[in-house]
């Protein structure tokens, strides 16, 4: 994922405790998990990654994938980019993988070919300008915008980044000709990857620094949190922020299914180690029996990795694994 490569360069330049990053158009979540891994490797537990997806149906997919990834420092929202304008200088890095005319997806998705037209290119270019202008106040002076599309059109790529630098105020980071041997092309303002010349689908990525002075130091409330609350941006309600340990029912704490997957899980439940066959059966929601394991809530694991919880009753157990994540294919 080349956008992740460019992001890691920005992280190397600006990375510090308390860093805030916005993944503006984040669904389905592959980019978010890549960013989260890079942030955790560089900063440990001291960062916040806000992953946003304006489309409600896609935001639910994003939220579920973030839950499976298990990093409690990732917050998921579903708002229009304009909603972030009220939070002046809130983010150190903004990654904007914006909606585009989709030429880089032609090989993968026949619908992208059917929907393409010159008019679509112009409409997308205008929409991308609107998105960048809307979110621009939320990027702090000296912060970095990583801008990407999955198209080859100059109007949506180099020209739009040049427009942002000129009209919004910034300096384009000169792209590097790093991987020509792997088919990565150099353009005026970024790098172009064409489907058929590189593994995967087409992509264009560029970056710019917002004009102004970058001032290190933590503003009030910038510390990344790992509990579930209303989030660090008042007025924007998160779909997901941290993972609750569970919910109380009948005087008993029922563990949240996602808690087992979270990096915040402290291992307070007895562990049951599964064979590969048992692990598949658990994910397939087949009946399982653990007569020799402790009664009550247990965390089931495969090769040391938590998969979820069961309520072990001895001769049978009730799974807490979400039905929406059940393996549907025949596992035999």
What do the PLM-derived regions correspond to, one by one?
Residues 91, 144-147, 151-237:
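Class I S-adenosyl-L-methionine
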Residues 54-89, 96:
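S-adenosyl-L-methionine
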Residues 48-53:
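Conserved SAM-binding motif I beta-strand of class I
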Residues 16-27:
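Conserved class I S-adenosyl-L-methionine
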């Amino acid at each position: 994922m080349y956008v992740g490569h460019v992001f890691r360069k920005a992280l190397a330049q600006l990375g510090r405790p308390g860093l805030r990053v916005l993944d503006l158009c984040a669904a389905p979540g592959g980019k978010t998990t890549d960013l989260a891994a890079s942030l955790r490797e560089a900063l440990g537990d001291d960062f916040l990654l806000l992953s946003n997806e304006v489309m409600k149906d896609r935001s639910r997919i994003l939220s579920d994938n973030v839950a499976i990834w298990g990093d409690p420092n990732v917050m998921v929202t579903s708002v229009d980019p304009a909603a972030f304008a009220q939070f002046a200088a809130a983010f150190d890095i903004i990654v904007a993988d914006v909606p585009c005319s989709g030429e880089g997806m032609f090989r993968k998705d026949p619908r992208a070919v059917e929907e393409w037209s010159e008019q679509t290119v112009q409409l997308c270019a205008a929409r991308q300008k609107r998105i960048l202008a809307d979110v621009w106040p939320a990027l702090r002076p000296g912060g970095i915008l990583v801008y990407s599309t999955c198209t080859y059109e100059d109007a949506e790529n180099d020209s739009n980044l040049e427009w942002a630098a000129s009209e919004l105020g910034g300096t384009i980071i000169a792209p590097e000709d790093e991987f020509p041997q792997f088919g990565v092309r150099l353009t005026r303002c970024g790098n172009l990857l064409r489907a058929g010349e590189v593994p995967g689908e087409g992509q264009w990525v560029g970056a710019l620094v917002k004009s102004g002075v970058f001032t290190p130091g933590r503003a009030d409330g910038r510390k990344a949190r790992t509990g579930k609350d209303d989030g660090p941006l008042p007025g924007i309600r998160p779909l997901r922020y941290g993972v609750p340990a569970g919910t109380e029912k009948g005087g008993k704490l029922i563990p949240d299914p996602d808690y087992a997957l979270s990096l915040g899980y402290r291992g307070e439940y007895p562990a049951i180690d599964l064979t590969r066959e048992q692990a598949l059966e658990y994910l397939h929601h087949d009946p399982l029996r653990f007569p020799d394991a402790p009664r009550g809530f247990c965390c089931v694991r495969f090769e040391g990795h938590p998969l979820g919880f069961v309520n072990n009753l001895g001769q049978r157990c009730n799974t807490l694994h979400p039905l929406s994540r059940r393996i549907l294919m025949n596992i035999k």
